[in-house]
A protein has these predicted regions:
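C-terminal solvent-exposed extensions
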Residues: 125, 269-369
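Amphipathic, coiled-coil-like alpha-helical scaffolding segments used for oligomerization/assembly
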Residues: 136-200, 273-275, 279
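Entry/capping segment at the start of metal-dependent catalytic domains
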Residues: 17-107, 281, 314
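Second-shell loop/turn segments in exported
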Residues: 85-88, 128-136, 151-156, 210, ...
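Flexible, polar/acidic helix-loop-strand segments at domain edges
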Residues: 71-72, 170-258
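Extracytoplasmic/secreted envelope proteins and their assembly/folding machinery
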Residues: 96, 127, 139-147, 162-166, ...
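N-terminal targeting leaders characterized by basic, low-complexity, disordered sequences
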Residues: 1-20
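Extracytoplasmic
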Residues: 71-74, 91-97, 106-114, 125, ...
Length: 369
């Protein structure tokens, strides 16, 4: 073979290799996008929402904070909605509330799950469960609640209807999960409503005994929503993370065409305050982001049987001020932080209202989880 032909062959091989690499990179990017969307569905983060024409965008024009800048980090509120009407605005209670804090230098992302039954100050006046804020005023009210009570500077949000998760799981042919007797019974019960809302079918597990099962979209979403077992809302968070991991693993096995179909399917279930320019800016570093530590808030808590003037079950921080200190130590370990007067006032009010006080031996300490 002549040198000229060898050179041509080499060029052809290089071109083929470039095309393969381009396709592989595009597939990897789509996998990351979908993983982040799934994270958001379960209350985590979504950065790569490229097909923006299909998303619902809400401009947050009246975001408030307690005067804190928190430079060096980008904080995003993530809401997983329990929507029956496919409406992503106010009127929906948030099934999941999370905060994604991105270290702009290292690209590491820390996630904090705020327990939805946590009693916090709402609209600067009354006290209610954290998940009530979105229902009353939509994403802007919910973001302001997080900023006011936790001394944060969140400027953006992403909301996803949890029903989108059922679509994704069905399109990756389900996930396999090990269930307890109690979980099978509760999942079967949740499936009735989930099936009705999604219009999707499922097969009831009978007999309802412990075992390893392949779950379709309706079943997996129902499993992730179970609350009424040992561990309550805290155990529910563990289930959500398991569904996330299982779904992410299946996404990595899909081809480019399937990934595109999945994105087209779930985009109408996404609402965000990010502009196209902001999302593309985040997306350019998609491969550099690394999901790091996660924890739940509050760190120290009680669930009193009764609170004067309130009915139902509430999660009460054992000293909001002390818990917020721990939160900042978790999110920003190398930055000094002193609670604002706003957080101190809210903390004192919660103490007086609920008769739940901080542990004096733990006050001001940090327990990263």
């Amino acid at each position: 073979m002549s040198k000229r032909n060898k050179k041509r062959l080499t060029r052809r091989q290089q071109e083929i290799r470039r095309k393969r690499l381009k396709k592989r990179r595009r597939r990897r990017r789509l996998v990351i996008i979908l993983e982040l969307i799934i994270l958001c569905i379960l209350g985590t983060t979504a950065f790569g929402l490229f097909k923006l024409g299909k998303t619902e965008r809400t401009n947050l024009s009246n975001i408030k904070n307690n005067g804190l800048k928190q430079t060096g980090y980008t904080n995003v509120a993530l809401f997983g909605l329990d929507s029956r009407e496919k409406n992503l605005g106010k009127g929906n209670r948030t099934d999941t509330i999370m905060i994604a804090s991105i270290n702009n230098e290292t690209k590491k992302v820390k996630l904090v799950s705020v327990y939805r039954d946590t009693m916090l100050k709402q609209n600067g006046e009354h006290y209610d469960k954290a998940n009530a804020a979105y229902s009353v005023g939509g994403p802007e009210t919910a973001v302001n609640m997080l900023n006011e009570n936790l001394d944060l500077n969140i400027q953006d949000y992403v909301s996803v209807n949890f029903l989108a998760l059922a679509d994704v799981i069905d399109m990756v042919d389900g996930i396999t999960v090990k269930l307890t007797d109690e979980e099978v019974v509760n999942m079967n019960n949740y499936c009735v409503e989930t099936s009705k809302v999604t219009g999707k079918k499922y097969k009831k597990i009978e007999p309802a005994v412990a075992g390893t099962y392949k779950l379709n979209g309706v079943q997996a979403v129902s499993y992730a929503r179970i609350r009424y077992t040992a561990g309550g809302d805290y155990k529910r968070t563990e289930r959500q993370r398991l569904v996330l991991k299982k779904t992410a693993d299946k996404l990595k096995q899909q081809d480019l065409a399937t990934l595109n179909k999945i994105i087209d399917k779930v985009m109408p279930e996404v609402s965000t305050s990010f502009t196209t320019k902001e999302i593309l800016s985040l997306a350019t570093g998609a491969f550099d982001y690394e999901l790091g530590e996660t924890t739940g808030f509050p760190f120290d808590l009680e669930t009193p049987e009764q609170i004067p003037g309130y009915s139902g079950s509430y999660v009460i921080p054992k000293g909001l001020e002390e818990n917020v200190i721990k939160l900042h130590q978790f999110l920003y370990p190398n930055k000094d932080y002193t609670p604002t007067a706003t957080v101190t006032d809210i903390s004192n009010t919660l103490n007086d209202m609920t008769n739940v006080y901080p542990n004096t031996t733990e006050s001001g300490t940090s327990q990263n989880e």
